[in-house]
Regions:
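Helix-terminus/linker motif at the lipid-water interface of multi-pass membrane proteins
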Residues: 1-12, 83-87, 148-152, 215-246, ...
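Alpha-helical transmembrane segments of polytopic membrane transporters and translocases
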Residues: 2, 14-30, 61, 205-206, ...
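Membrane-interface junctions at transmembrane-helix termini in multi-pass inner-membrane proteins
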Residues: 108-135, 145, 179, 323-354
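Helix-loop junctions and terminal segments of transmembrane helices
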Residues: 2, 31-47, 122, 184, ...
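Interhelical loop/hinge segments that connect adjacent transmembrane helices in multipass membrane
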Residues: 154-161, 173-218, 261, 268-276
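Interfacial segments at transmembrane-helix termini and the short loops linking adjacent helices
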Residues: 80-102, 297-327
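Hydrophobic alpha-helical transmembrane segments
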Residues: 131-182, 203, 244, 353-358, ...
Length: 390
């Protein structure tokens, strides 16, 4: 991130962050289906007479259709919003449009790859998942260094997203080849199955509420910061997101390995083991974040100075508050997985998901009232604590 920030500059980094974030907002749809795909494949694997092949072929069909629908939405509403509503310097608008198209293509590729990624996680092939994750990071680092230090004269905000597209294609092809080779169900062709579609659609509709809340809390807040303060504050938000992702990644990887076990133990009827996983997983993931969050919160300014040199205004406050938000949110992650495993998520999503959606309107009211940008994180902490009580 330091190289990217120095390479692009604060203004272009803010553009890259806010335009990419706008595209990511549409992940609300794919996230709902991704959760359904992971749940149903894992559940079928946990059953003695399960049929993961039918789930996978149906999921692949749905994601291909979804990719086409999302592409249409981006090229109509998305382009209009980018050019008419977002606060971007006029002289960088053509480049912002290119970043938008590159982000759209990367997003479409990721949608199509969701069933294959879900299959790897459901089969608990964490060695492959970790290897491809490391490969993605290494490729990104190589591309960043190339763009930053290449002895050519080009617009870095055009070349960098182009290389990210290439990286995304390579990673998704790797998942495709691995799944086709090792998992029999992944050799099925896309197929519409009315029975599985009905179950997955019903699950996804209710899960849509939680995904909407997550997108509004993340990229929705990023959009609000752009509308009220411009791209410089978006750059600070991007820095905070990067730090938070690095810290939360430890707990996230732990949860990725734990979640299939919770779902499979429920499918097999082993409730005692499931509850022990929920309890230990919640405590361990909280401590994983806490170990890194405390020193970072205490020495945020020094860490950012060493890491980035000159960092955007509000970065220190944003990092500290975003880490606090993560500590509150991580407590309930295993409970969410357990509730998802049952397939009965309507009441949960209406209560907790509905509460989480309040992040966006409450943040808008706070900013409209003249509060500082940091107020959006205070709102997130208060809403998160309220959800724990539910």
């Amino acid at each position: 991130s330091r190289v990217i920030l120095n390479m692009l500059g604060v203004e272009d980094y803010g553009i890259y962050n806010v335009v990419g974030g706008f595209v990511s907002m549409f992940a609300i749809i794919s996230s709902a289906l991704s959760s359904a795909t992971s749940r149903f494949i894992t559940f079928e694997l946990g059953k003695k007479d399960g049929n993961p092949g039918r789930v996978f072929s149906n999921a692949l069909f749905i994601h291909l259709v979804l990719a086409a629908i999302v592409l249409f939405a981006f090229e109509t509403f998305g382009l209009w919003f980018l050019n008419e509503k977002m606060v971007i310097p006029e002289h960088r608008m053509p480049v912002a449009n290119y970043v938008f198209q590159a982000s759209v293509l990367s997003f479409i590729i990721s949608i199509i790859g969701v069933p294959f990624t879900s299959a790897v996680i459901a089969h608990e092939r964490m060695d492959t998942f970790a290897f491809l994750g490391v490969l993605e990071v290494v490729m990104k680092l190589v591309f960043v260094l190339f763009v930053a230090y290449a002895p050519f004269n080009f617009d870095k905000l055009i070349v960098f997203p182009s290389l990210m597209i290439g990286m995304g294609i390579c990673i998704q092809l790797s998942y495709w080849f691995f799944c086709r080779k090792h998992f029999e169900e992944c050799r099925c062709r896309p197929k519409f199955d009315r029975g599985y579609f009905r179950d997955m659609f019903s699950f996804s509709v209710w899960n849509f509420i939680g995904c909407t809340a997550g997108i509004l809390k993340g990229q929705g807040i990023n959009m609000l910061l752009n509308l009220f303060f411009g791209t410089v504050v978006n750059a600070a938000y991007g820095v905070a997101c990067t730090v938070n992702s690095a810290v939360s990644g430890f707990a996230g990887n732990f949860m990725t390995a734990l979640n299939p076990q919770i779902t499979k133990s429920y499918a097999s009827g082993d409730r005692e083991y499931m509850f022990s996983l929920i309890d230990r997983g919640s405590r361990f993931s909280f401590y994983l974040i806490l170990i890194f969050a405390i020193p970072l919160m205490l020495e945020t300014d020094h860490v950012l100075a060493i890491w980035l040199g000159d960092y955007p205004e509000y970065s220190v406050a944003f990092v500290r508050l975003m880490l606090a938000v993560s500590l509150v949110d991580i407590i309930s992650n295993t409970l969410i997985t357990a509730q998802t495993a049952t397939g009965k998520i309507r009441n949960y999503q209406l209560a907790v998901g509905g509460m989480l959606m309040m992040n966006f309107p409450f943040s808008y009211i706070a900013l409209k009232s003249g509060c500082s940008p940091s107020a959006v994180f205070v709102v997130a902490i208060m809403v998160g604590l309220a959800c724990l009580l539910l």
